Amino acid sequence: MERETQTYFFPDDGRIPNHPDFPLVVYQNALKDTGLAERIVTRHGWSNSWSGSVFPYHHYHSNTHEVLIALRREAVIQFGGEKGAAIPFKSGDAVVIPAGVGHKKLSSSPDFTVLGAYPGGVQYDMKTGKPNEREEAVKQIKQAALPANDPITGKREPLLEIWVK
């Protein structure tokens, strides 16, 4: 199957700020061999990786972007807050989540597993949309550094071609 990308832009919903400029980028069929996922993203400059599931509540990272790669099975992940999009996510798919974009697992198979990583290995923060975290989070979202490379291709495209116009 050929890799396909889709983009989704989410406006600030009052609770989850989302990113003011960058869309979510979904890569369907990103990797044929998910066993190589960590090696691939690390080689492309994305590290501080972890594997597990996605939290079942809305959260976001204000200080960094994030890549998620579905390693095993499938899930439906909601991006962009309560009014966002519910996107099917299956083994081999990937998504680059801009700083500030909310995400939560709506449903999954019992052994659904993802790999998460961050450009330059940034130590990510965890925000849940509480009013007292918003002002600082909005500032940090705008300051989150652009990654040097696309985590899947290791090149400028497609991620930076989409984000930098």
UniProtKB/Swiss-Prot annotation:
It comes from the Bacteria. Residues 28-139 form the Cupin type-1 domain. PANTHER family: BLR7373 PROTEIN (PTHR36448), CUPIN TYPE-1 DOMAIN-CONTAINING PROTEIN (PTHR36448:SF2). This is Uncharacterized protein YjlB. The gene is yjlB.
